[in-house]
Amino acid sequence: MERYDVVLIQEVKDKGQTSISKLWRLLNTTTGEDWGMVKSGRLGKSSRYKEQYVFFYRLQVARLAGSYQVPESRLYAREPFSVQLDYDSYCENDHDYFYYDGSHCEKTVVLMGLHAQPDQAVSELTQLATSIRRVARVFPHADGVVAMGDFNADCSYASEDEREDLEIFSSRHFRSLIPDTADTTSGRSDCAYDRVVVYGSDVMVRDAQVYNFREDLGLSAKVAAKVSDHYPVEFKLY
């Protein structure tokens, strides 16, 4: 996680939230920097199974300007959760994930997380375009919205034909940064489940990719599986 300035973690199931608090403390101590944390409520239609979205961000880089939870409905198993972050473009320091572009020193972006239910991924992703526009209206001063997460947008959950009919992948108003050919899983499957979708022409991004931590860190398949069954998807804002 030290690789990043802002991190979204999904599928947090710990009801007591001790694990996420421990991770927060470790981030602060191991990096030597202060990190902020903002989390959604516990989401899910079953009383026995709920998840949370959690954003971590370097306080040296970003400031939380607001958050928004899409209201509960039957449209999602776990409604999207968004944060608005004001961030410095690093006029005077060496981080390269947010950096000075020569004309601005501060920008604002909305980051939205969605963990789509596998067996209703297509219907949730159909609704996602509407939810993104809604969040853009909630935060009208932001440059735009970046929706991300495990969309389950591939293989048996969302076919190529089904994806072609989805507005987030077909409309000129949206930019999908992770290609269908990507593999975002750390196991034996080869599926582009995890995606990044940008809404708003003022959101400037580059270098979107899947971070294969197993290969980069030289981990065995067994160890990598203990870290996560998905690889992170990453991008740079400028």
Task: State the predicted function of each range.
Residues 1-238:
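Divalent cation-coordinating acidic motifs and surrounding scaffolds
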